[in-house]
Amino acid sequence: MIKAYFGAETFTLNKDFAYILVIGTTDVSLIPGLTIAGATPELTHFTPAADAEYVILGKCKSINTIPVSPTGIPTPALLTRASLSFTKSLKIVVNAGSRITPKIPYIDLQGEPGKDIRKQALSIEKVNIIIENGIKLGEELSNEYELIMIGESIPAGTTTAMATLLALGYDAMDKVSSASPDNPKELKRKVVEEALRNLPTDPLQRLAKVSDPVLLGVAGISLGFRGKILLAGGTQMTAAAAIVNEFDKSKLKDIIIGTTKWIVEDKSADMLSLAKQVGVKVLASMLDLSISIHEGIRTYEKGYVKEGVGAGGSTIMAFIRGVSNSTLVRKIDELYSELVGSNNLNT
């Protein structure tokens, strides 16, 4: 139920781990048509906080339903919570810079929400603070764990990831995925091309111009952690790995990306090309949701949502621990049914 790329099968994941969910927002998500990671562009700023609340509590406090797409498809946090129920992992929420903060305990990296990358995403001071505090958190986690899994939640994060990869010199134009089956590549390209005009020469200044708080937070934690790291995400995690590579080229040997089959098989993108360029190994979960009893879950098989909140990495961790596809889908269906029954989901 897991496919390995670039020698990823040699990476050992069958040990105790901590799940770290890094959340943040970027004003890029307010651009109409760019992301479906929220029912409306304005609601995308609530998605990261609500995702975090659902993973930890099984319900949301910041909004009255779990995050859904404009057509009602549920957040991948559902897959993450179901998968992690089969593990004994510690779950930690880290706020790198979210406009809406979750109503649960979390660790704050003292960052700031990302602004529009066409102007200036972050101040250089906040870039340094997010990375430095992320490194410190990674170092502290090293005292208790040999393995961590890092997930992300930031609507429009694939657009900032593409801008970040291009700013760091990678061939990334039109290679990032989308939560929609109809990847808005033309709009993404237009936004990113505008963001990349008059880029400064200094790499940190470039990150401040076009990146987002989550990419920086994930990179910082990864740089500080002394053990093995599973970056649980899609094309965004290739950008996080690229930032790590800017600071410490020796670190990538300890990092692997764990994602979903919907990302690696996405014909509108090329995640594997990005991973190969950066030099990071990839595992893909072959989770099959076509047997789900819920149409909203089966829709994932049509290319909707694809990844987020560490869904791919979490399902990989469940599979490695002997959980079957049918058992995992039953758990996902059970959680979805609970949401429908509690009116914590608009259907």
Curated annotation (Swiss-Prot):
Gene Ontology terms, MF aspect: nicotinate-nucleotide-dimethylbenzimidazole phosphoribosyltransferase activity
Lineage: Archaea, Thermoproteota, Thermoprotei, Sulfolobales, Sulfolobaceae
Pfam family name, one: DBI_PRT
Disulfide bonds, paired cysteine numbers: none
Cited SUPFAM superfamilies: Nicotinate mononucleotide:5,6-dimethylbenzimidazole phosphoribosyltransferase (CobT) (SSF52733)
InterPro entries: Nict_dMeBzImd_PRibTrfase (IPR003200), Nict_dMeBzImd_PRibTrfase_arc (IPR002805), Nict_dMeBzImd_PRibTrfase_sf (IPR036087)
Record family assignment: Belongs to the UPF0284 family.
Protein name as it appears in the record: UPF0284 protein SSO2213
